[in-house]
Amino acid sequence: MQAEDRSQFGSAAEMLSEQTAALGTGWESMNVQLDGAEPQVERGSQEERPWRTVPGPLEHLCCDLEEEPQSLQEKAQSAPWVPAIPQEGNTGDWEMAAALLAAGSQGLVTIKDVSLCFSQEEWRSLDPSQTDFYGEYVMQENCGIVVSLRFPIPKLDMLSQLEGGEEQWVPDPQDLEERDILRVTYTGDGSEHEGDTPELEAEPPRMLSSVSEDTVLWNPEHDESWDSMPSSSRGMLLGPPFLQEDSFSNLLCSTEMDSLLRPHTCPQCGKQFVWGSHLARHQQTHTGERPYSCLKCEKTFGRRHHLIRHQKTHLHDKTSRCSECGKNFRCNSHLASHQRVHAEGKSCKGQEVGESPGTRKRQRAPPVPKCHVCTECGKSFGRRHHLVRHWLTHTGEKPFQCPRCEKSFGRKHHLDRHLLTHQGQSPRNSWDRGTSVF
């Protein structure tokens, strides 16, 4: 069956090539020679369906509906497709038809080879579903046939690089400088505007390396029909997201503090403050208010940290007070030394007139009352331990005894001096050197 179809197609192609060589007036005569019985198609129907099959010897391939689906499918793939012949003649259309016939004479032409041979007006008239169907057949293996039909396909250099195993095409920065690069700005509502800001210049789109080698990536700069093509036929482009210069000003306005826009001003001196608490603290200097007071001494302060610093002075209460001058002291020993000063002052007041303080001998403080009295001799002492030590002289008791020679002593320092003799040291030398037995 396929051999018969090829022979029929070859005879039809030879006859059609001879007839096209003799044509010189219009496309109507060519339609009559191809099929004299075929009615002329209206202009409106040609725009709706730009492609149709060639009637004639291959007409039985699509008319036999009783055959098996598989055989019908094989016949449909082998059937040649030619463009609908327009009413008016055009030199470009003649060249496309001649190239199509030359390609068909070499072998069967499938729908995949010529599925994208549309003009720009015809491509725009297709539905999105049709453009998706035809667009996916723009492959590397079919580019040669499509180019032979003079269909404009960009990025032919990339196809040669793909065949040689080179990297995909990346735009040259020098070429991009010659082009008018749109500079867009972001207004916050999703709209784009042209601008002269060099920092926001859009970078040229680059192709992803993960795109298949059989897919031709289209660029809107080379074809006006880019807007009408579906997203699946446009290829994959990579570019940075567009920044908009107004977004920086909007971001700044949103982050500015309301207090900076409406500062707090002092009505008296005109000073401005960021925070209202700072203004309230400043106004205390004008009113003289002291809201912080000490609970112990009832002192008032204008700052809280001043009150905290003052409260540290109350941690150590000064209970020792001098009865003469009213001074407070933390220790009683300090009070006793202070009272000696008052005693010396009183003695100085009682000195004779004309006697200078330098010639006056220093007088001791008044003696401590001797309340501890010895019952044997009636001697009195100011300290109790002095009385105990004196009592030993009456009893003859010697409580301090040497552990080596069992000698006893009435005073402890006498025993310490005796122990130095057992060590071979002189008590005088040991005391001079400041050494001790223990």
From Swiss-Prot:
The lineage of its organism: Eukaryota, Metazoa, Chordata, Craniata, Vertebrata. One of its GO terms (molecular function) is DNA-binding transcription factor activity, RNA polymerase II-specific. Pfam families: KRAB (PF01352), zf-C2H2 (PF00096). The gene is ZNF641. It is found in: Nucleus. GO terms for biological process: regulation of transcription by RNA polymerase II. Residues 171-265 are annotated as: Transactivation. InterPro entries: KRAB (IPR001909), KRAB_dom_sf (IPR036051), Znf_C2H2_sf (IPR036236), Znf_C2H2_type (IPR013087). Residues 109-181 form the KRAB domain. This is Zinc finger protein 641.
